[in-house]
């Protein structure tokens, strides 16, 4: 007769499977490692996940992750408020920050257009992006919008849509240079390549 795992262990394995790239076997190995070798680490992990889930929210201005209503980047008067960089995820924002070449503000889409998956303009907050880029009470109108979506087919389609939307409002719109490889995602590109792509950006 096949032995069954305790219910709480099964629940842990299933919970770990929500992580990207983690299949059933990997989740099982993680669960057994935590319980067999690092129970204190497991408790800290649980507390950290619970704390983040309870306290992290979206910035009301740029939509990135923050614990406040407005994030520190949006509140930083030392940054160039005339330039707005549009990225897909907070992880992409971190990658651009690590280049130390960009000192403007951001807007985070939290995704990209993918009609086959039911992700349209509303799901990636393009109405909020338009307001952020144009309305004075939100810091607009900005002098330039840099579209830094990934160079995947969905990212390119998103960049084109955003470019047309903002150019119709008279805004200058640019795109990262092709230093980032086709199909590449910013999260996995080195900082030097991203820095060059930002500096050599082209008009849309």
UniProtKB/Swiss-Prot annotation:
SMART domains with a match to the protein in the record: TOPRIM (SM00493)
Single Gene Ontology BP annotation: DNA recombination
Zinc finger (C4-type): 59-74
Keywords: DNA damage, DNA recombination, DNA repair, Metal-binding, Zinc, Zinc-finger
Residues in Toprim domain copies: 82-181
SUPFAM superfamilies, sorted: Recombination protein RecR (SSF111304)
GO molecular function: DNA binding; zinc ion binding
PROSITE patterns tied to this protein: TOPRIM (PS50880)
CDD domains (alphabetical): TOPRIM_recR
Pfam family, one: Toprim_4
Stored InterPro entries: DNA_Rcmb_RecR, Rcmb_RecR, Rcmb_RecR_Znf, TOPRIM_dom, TOPRIM_RecR
Gene3D superfamilies membership: 3.40.1360.10, 6.10.250.240, RecR Domain 1 (1.10.8.420)
Family recorded in the similarity comment: Belongs to the RecR family.
Role played: May play a role in DNA repair. It seems to be involved in an RecBC-independent recombinational process of DNA repair. It may act with RecF and RecO.
Name listed for the protein in its UniProt record: Recombination protein RecR
Source organism: Cupriavidus taiwanensis (strain DSM 17343 / BCRC 17206 / CCUG 44338 / CIP 107171 / LMG 19424 / R1) (Ralstonia taiwanensis (strain LMG 19424))
Lineage: Bacteria, Pseudomonadati, Pseudomonadota, Betaproteobacteria, Burkholderiales
Gene name linked to the record: recR
């Amino acid at each position: 007769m096949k032995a069954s795992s305790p219910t709480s262990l099964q629940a842990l394995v299933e919970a770990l499977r929500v992580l990207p790239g983690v299949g059933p076997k990997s989740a099982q190995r993680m669960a057994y490692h935590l319980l067999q070798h690092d129970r204190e680490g497991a408790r800290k992990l649980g507390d950290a996940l619970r704390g983040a889930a309870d306290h992290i929210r979206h910035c009301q201005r740029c939509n990135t992750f923050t614990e406040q209503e407005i994030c520190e980047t949006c509140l930083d008067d030392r940054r160039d408020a005339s330039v707005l960089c549009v990225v897909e995820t907070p992880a992409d924002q971190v990658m651009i920050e690590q280049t130390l070449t960009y000192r403007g503000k951001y807007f985070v889409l939290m995704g990209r257009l993918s009609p086959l998956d039911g992700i349209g303009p509303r799901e990636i907050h393009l109405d909020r992006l338009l307001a952020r880029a144009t309305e004075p009470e939100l810091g607009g109108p900005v002098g330039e919008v840099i579209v830094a979506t990934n160079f995947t087919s969905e990212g390119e389609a998103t960049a084109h849509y955003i470019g047309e939307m903002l150019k119709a409002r008279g805004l200058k719109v640019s795109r990262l240079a092709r230093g980032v490889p086709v199909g590449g995602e910013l999260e996995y590109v080195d900082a030097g390549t991203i820095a060059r792509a930002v500096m050599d950006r082209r008009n849309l």
